[in-house]
UniProtKB/Swiss-Prot annotation:
Database matches in InterPro entries: ENTH_VHS, HGS/VPS27, UIM_dom, VHS_dom, Vps27_GAT-like, Znf_FYVE, Znf_FYVE-rel, Znf_FYVE_PHD
Organism from which the protein derives: Aspergillus terreus (strain NIH 2624 / FGSC A1156)
Pfam families the record matches: FYVE, UIM, VHS, Vps27_GAT-like
GO terms for MF: phosphatidylinositol-3-phosphate binding; ubiquitin binding; zinc ion binding
Polar residues bias locations: 232-249, 335-353
Protein name per the record: Vacuolar protein sorting-associated protein 27
Amino acid sequence: MAGWFSSASPLDEQVERATSSSLEDIALNLEISDLIRSKSVQPKEAMRSLKRRLENKNPNVQLATLKLTDTCVKNGGTHFLAEIASREFMDNLVSLLKTEGLQLNTEVKEKMLELIQDWAMAAQGRMDLSYVGQTYQRLQEEGFRFPPKTQISGSMLESSAPPEWIDSDVCMRCRTAFSFMNRKHHCRNCGNVFDAQCSSKTLPLPHLGILQPVRVDDGCYAKLTSKAAQSSGLSDRTSFKNNSITKSSAMEPRTARAEGGFDDDLRRALQMSLEEAQNKGSSGYVPQPKVAQEPPKPSGQPTAEEEEDADLKAAIEASLRDMEEHKQKHAAALKNTTSETPSHQPQNTTTLPKNPYELSPVEVENIHLFAALVDRLQHQPPGTILREPQIQELYESIGTLRPKLARSYGETMSKHDTLLDLHSKLSTVVRYYDRMLEERLSSAYSQHSLGYGSIPSGPGYPNVYPSMPPTAEGKAGAENFYYGNSVVENPLTASNPQYPQAAPDMMSREKDTHARRPYEPQYVYTALHSLSTTILQWNGAPATDLHSPPPSANVP
């Protein structure tokens, strides 16, 4: 009798099968999320179906329903996220957490808190999902204990869904007006409106969760079939139309193709890295194992993997070539060293101590490879790292190098400090040496400029000064005549032992002249000659003795 008044929808039946108390059916969960994303069912209806399933008293059913809800949130599209973030659904979760009569199962409660926290962190910055963050903050203030936070990107909630339909009075391709005979048709791929002539093609849209052939316009049909032809190698578009159901795997989204190509290259690189890491323990040079060449593929159009991952392959090949060149150079250097070393003098050969904390080229290459893989995984879906256990093995092998790397870094820093100390000492020594050179040069120059010595003997120098008249007015008159001064009225007599007061003035002038002019031998001899001539004039010598050597008497 109850079946006459209530009938379960197909979605309710699928939700009931997916949330049964048995093991989780991931394939059925993804199928339900595709139905929601393709808008085959209304998002509010799907939300209420999950809400009713959470009212079940069986903890296993509740856990399965929460997992199904999380799968639909991540793959159901924006229109379903808006229903999950509504007050109707979030307040129902809060009421289940605050149940007083019958205590909620511990695992169910922890799973609810974990999902609310993850959804709130992923929905940060989105106004249409703000109620999830408000609910999360309110539960924190009320004292609910959430699990440790995990960094979740907002891209977790991004999934492709069919676009909203756009209305128009004319066809958006041929601009023909719609009428009673010319009806409107919407393209499921772009959401624009067309007439029957411009939208007569049908295609499945797996990237939008639509696996059955649906109506698309001519422009979208050309784009999708051209991509399918490049990925599957088909040249005829009609063959894809007739076999669209059986060959729907060829219409995978671009992200899936890129992920497949990345997995193959990643697996190949990890295998080579692990082989090198296993061989690093043996002593001596270990040649790199030759990679078995794959059989040549039939010539044709390039596959999607080669198109999407050409940069990654080129980087891996360049890295392998560099490693091979380094190993060949190392082997050649070892061979030359062995050939040049005489075999009959083993006691004279000395080998440099090898640093036990120095990283080998293979270890350095593994570190660079792991860094490149981690950087590449940041742009991949979250589940990529879980499908490749080789990454964990590479991480463990690199983790053992951390003490070695730290010790090597410490020794390098100590060497750096030692070299800086030596550099400062060397700079100080060079500065002292330069100062000593400057002091010696200055002292030598001063001694050479002050100590002229005696005038060498030889032919007399020509008299560049005019001869004194025979009736000179004494020594003062000769001095005045020499310097061009006026004649003193009271000249000194021969009996006066006092020297004229102009002599210090003359000496200062001679010193100034020596300081201003450069050091030249002819000028030195001329200056000495003029000085001796003046002294002879003071002593009353005749004018004919001006060119003779100076007297040996001490001049005051």
